[in-house]
A protein has these predicted regions:
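Aromatic-enriched alpha-helical interface/lid elements that frame and gate functional surfaces
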Residues: 108-184, 188
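Short secondary-structure transition/capping segments
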Residues: 8-10, 153-158, 200-204
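Conserved PLP cofactor-binding pocket of PLP-dependent enzymes
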Residues: 182-206
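Active-site-adjacent "lid/gating" segments in soluble enzymes
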Residues: 1-120, 124
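Short secondary-structure capping/turn micro-motifs that flank functional sites
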Residues: 79, 150, 197-198
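Residue-level detector of conserved catalytic or cofactor/ligand-binding positions
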Residues: 213-223
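Short, surface-exposed loop/helix-turn segments at secondary-structure junctions
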Residues: 90-97, 200-212
Length: 223
């Protein structure tokens, strides 16, 4: 869980503990929920991927050096490595990043918005996409409002901006907005549950589900 050397090396661990100690949980959820773990055992999965990549890299290096290498990974280090720009923000500002829920910690507008029949995830990840997003919603006038002219200002006034956006997105269905936004070039998608996701056309198109045939048991499906 913590690597083969150092203070924590002999401590027992599972994914949940790694999520807690790595700081990962502290960034999930909102101020109301407190720390929240991810539904999937992400440290187990990421550590396994890093290990596989390390093994392949060591095998490739052996062709040139004729020497083997020790490949090691840990649950906690794997999660810490995923902090990316969040850790960069801390190193530069010395400020601990706060939970942002479904909002983005450094971008606005960005997140989950209400529709006539549910919710929609929308990700205008730069100024150009923000302009496209607001124009698609017929809210381009906001681009001229002093409160929202830059991303920094939109972050400061995010609650009010989200309120205005929600008032518009609630007028039509999720599918309506997904079509409109994707056609305009703005990334948007529906929030699917497990059943919906595994039966979505994307899963079929990418051959993600396998049929496992057993001689004495019914055929099972698996990813």
């Amino acid at each position: 869980g913590f690597g083969s050397t150092g203070k924590y090396s002999q401590r027992p661990a599972f994914d949940f503990i790694a999520q807690a100690i790595s700081g990962f949980m502290s960034l999930n959820g909102s101020e109301k929920t407190g720390p929240v773990r991810t539904a999937a055992p992400i440290s187990d999965l990421i550590a396994g991927l890093y290990c596989a990549f390390g093994i392949v890299s060591a095998i490739n290096a052996r062709h040139n050096t004729k020497k083997g290498q020790v490949v090691e990974t840990s649950l906690t280090s794997s999660l810490i490595s995923l902090m990316a720009y969040l850790s960069a923000e801390y190193f530069v500002t010395d400020k601990t990043p706060k939970k942002s829920g479904n909002d983005h910690p450094i971008l606005s507008p960005y997140g989950l918005f209400k529709t006539k029949d549910g919710n929609i995830a929308i990700a205008p990840a730069n100024d150009k996409l923000c302009e496209i997003f607001l124009r698609t919603l017929n809210l381009e006038y906001l681009l001229e409002v002093d409160l929202y002219k830059t991303n920094s200002l939109r972050m400061i006034n995010r609650n009010k901006l989200n309120e205005i956006i929600n008032q518009t997105t609630e007028l039509n269905t999720t599918d309506y907005w997904i079509k409109k936004l994707n056609e305009s070039g703005c990334p948007a998608g529906k929030v699917l549950d497990m059943k919906e996701a595994l039966n979505d056309q994307l899963v079929e198109d990418t051959d993600m589900v396998l049929s496992l045939i057993h001689i004495s048991e019914p055929t099972r499906q698996s990813l």
